[in-house]
Amino acid sequence: YYRDFLPDILAANRGSMDWATWRQVPILQRADLQAHGQSLNSERVPESHLPLSTGKTSGSTGRPVDLVGTRLTDAMWNAFTLRGHLWHGRDLSARLATIKIFAQPHPALLDQGLVLPTWGPATEMFSPRGDAVILSATVPVSQQWRWLKAQQPAYLLSYPSNLAALAEESLQQDVGLESLRGVISIGERLTAAQRQLCRAAWQLEIKDIYSAEEVGYIAHQSPQ
């Protein structure tokens, strides 16, 4: 991809690649990723970075983008995941519940949910380690709430809008979730009103994560 225009930029700057030259390199746009995805992939991936993995963005802001990751990008993602858990003092031996959208959901995710042996690759090296329960966010909120009551997780991860809907369900029924120790939001802009709803329902502060499939973690909410 860059071979098409970098030689011209370098020639115009007598082969110099200083900051002034870098500023002439066009900023990569989402449309560029969609139109030139294959030519943006490295042709010489180091052996130590293999195997490659593939993925796709959610398409929440437009047409999805196809992605290619490496062993190194996976390691970095897991490292930042673990750092977030440790920053917020989460008990890795407890249960984590995740409610989100799945591109190709297992039938159980639309009904009783699934139980996984660990929270994921970032924590599976620890012992004792907690399990994870997952459910599709397309399930009605009332059913999600019943499922949470049955699963009794220590931590709940979902979208801000879904967390707010669950908090409203909890307040309407005047029933809390005694096991809950932490709430984590992903995938959407978190508002002050949504924070307040969770505070009122569960006496807990939402810990927000800002990330994207294309680049991984962008920001973690400060523990302070």
How should each PLM-predicted stretch be described?
Residues 15-18, 73, 115, 141-143, ...:
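Acidic, low-complexity intrinsically disordered regions
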Residues 67-69, 108-110, 168:
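A short secondary-structure junction signal
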Residues 1-56, 62-95, 102, 150-157, ...:
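Nucleotide 5′-phosphate-binding alpha/beta core
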Residues 77, 108, 218:
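Short Asp/Glu-rich motifs
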Residues 125-224:
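Active-site glycine/GP-rich loop and adjacent strand/helix microenvironment
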Residues 48-58, 106-114, 137-141, 161, ...:
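Short low-complexity stretches enriched in small and charged residues
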Residues 11-17, 116-128:
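Intrinsically disordered, low-complexity coil segments
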Residues 82, 86-122, 132-135:
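Conserved AMP-binding loop of ANL adenylate-forming enzymes
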